[in-house]
Amino acid sequence: CCSYTNLNIKKYRTLAGRDFGESELNEARDMFLFSFYARGMSFVDMCYLRKTKVWNEALHYERQKTHQVFSVALTPQLREIIFRYDDPGSPWVLPCMQRGMLSSANKQEDMNGDVPPASLYNFYCMALHYYLILLKEISRRLGCRNLTFNVARHTWATEARSMGVPTPHISEGLGHTSERTTRIYLASLDRQTVDEVNERVTKL
């Protein structure tokens, strides 16, 4: 079933094809899958992903944790989720920030205006709490340990490893650059290589 760090292929396919009959649960499922399809993108980066960062057939974003800039090619799965949750009145690619705003004390914030960083961070925290509760219910229905966005991230890495993808490619896909030797090696990898890795992994 699920381990604490990754979701096995059987359960992943069950999750991806499951209609939970409730829009909130289906949305949480899609946010989990988006993270997986986007090379294990961190939930905080999903929250802060603006529509202006989608161009040239790719998502371009700066990791909140490291401030490094990454690009992820738009796969059919990513396009489908983005289209499903597109809100013409929102500056965000995904509904995460809106969910956080609706869960916070300040529900009147103009998301198209100059929102204070502290408010955005609060919305992110509330959104994370919101989705984790829903993922816990999804986990119960699937009969496995609790799903989190870290599980999506580790699942991507685990599947890439099982396909024989070199560790440096996996590190680049996840945005890991903490080890000096890995950083030196990754400098020679281009985006196309990493996108090809992601295409292989997400065709499960």
What do these predicted ranges mean?
Residues C1-F43, C47:
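Basic, Lys/Arg- and aromatic-enriched nucleic-acid-binding interface segment
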Residues N6, R63-H67, L174-E199:
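Catalytic-site neighborhood detector that most strongly recognizes the C-terminal catalytic loop/helix
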Residues N6-R13, T75-R145:
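Active-site/catalytic core of tyrosine-dependent DNA strand-transfer enzymes
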Residues T14, S71-P76, E80, R84-Y85, ...:
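DNA/chromatin major-groove-contacting recognition/catalytic segments
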Residues G17-E24, F123-Y124, L132-E172:
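Short, basic (Lys/Arg/His-rich) helix/loop patches that form interaction surfaces
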Residues F34-S35, L49, E159-A160, G173:
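Short alpha-helical segment immediately N-terminal to, or the first helix within
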Residues Y48-F83:
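Conserved tyrosine-mediated DNA breakage-rejoining catalytic core shared by Y-recombinases
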Residues T52-A58, R145-N146, V165-I184:
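Short, polar N-cap/turn motifs at the start of nucleic acid-interacting alpha helices
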